[in-house]
């Protein structure tokens, strides 16, 4: 008798396939600030968060609130961070993108005003302010896509810290394993053609080949719905 596929087991929501979110430090959001004012805070620590690739900064604000914010390059313990419409445009400060001069780098950009930050949050990435109009601001994303946003959307001035992460190799499988354990991912991933026939429709056989067409209908049952699902075309483009 066959077994459930990994894609079927994921849907059950067991701990194997769930992210250990109880270990995550905080949900990073820009602090709420009244219009035409600013809020100052001091960086009291730089910490690691298993939920993300970039370091986070613990900031104690003058209103008594302590928050974790995404750390930008150059931030250090003891630095002062400003947030609000009146904040100076310098690395680490949180300002509306409408106040940022063209050509400046920004990160942790809001999609809508006061949503806390949605875009450009991975280590070492940044967006660029391209141009301003009366009711919108153009921002060049890391992908090269130009996004038009409300000028009241806030962002952190500068580049996300931790830019050298992708240049450092893992070297040991154990380190990669423990990193993947912090995410909702099963690791290591076994190729379908390397499995037994009871584990996957593409498994079994004397050599590693699917043994059947890899295209499958959109309406196929869960145990068969693997491979190129409802593919319009297959193979290399000519």
UniProtKB/Swiss-Prot annotation:
Give GO terms for biological process.
cytoplasmic translation
Q: Which UniProt keywords apply?
A: Ribonucleoprotein, Ribosomal protein, RNA-binding, rRNA-binding
Q: Record keywords: Phosphoprotein included?
A: no
Whether rRNA-binding counts among this entry's keywords is: yes
User: Which one Pfam family would you cite for this protein?
Assistant: Ribosomal_L2
Q: Where is this region: Disordered?
A: 1-22, 202-223
Say which domain of life the source belongs to.
Archaea
Entries under InterPro entries matching the protein? NA-bd_OB-fold (IPR012340), Rib_uL2_dom2 (IPR014722), Ribosomal_uL2 (IPR002171), Ribosomal_uL2_arc_euk (IPR023672), Ribosomal_uL2_C (IPR022669), Ribosomal_uL2_dom3 (IPR014726), Ribosomal_uL2_RNA-bd_dom (IPR022666), Translation_prot_SH3-like_sf (IPR008991)
Per the record, its GO cellular-component terms are: cytosolic large ribosomal subunit
One MF annotation (Gene Ontology) recorded for this entry: RNA binding
Which residue stretches does the UniProt record annotate as biased composition, category Polar residues?
A: 1-11
> Would you identify the family this protein belongs to, as annotated?
Belongs to the universal ribosomal protein uL2 family.
Record note on quaternary structure: Part of the 50S ribosomal subunit. Forms a bridge to the 30S subunit in the 70S ribosome.
Its job: One of the primary rRNA binding proteins. Required for association of the 30S and 50S subunits to form the 70S ribosome, for tRNA binding and peptide bond formation. It has been suggested to have peptidyltransferase activity; this is somewhat controversial. Makes several contacts with the 16S rRNA in the 70S ribosome.
**Protein name stated in the entry:** Large ribosomal subunit protein uL2
Q: Which gene encodes it?
A: rpl2
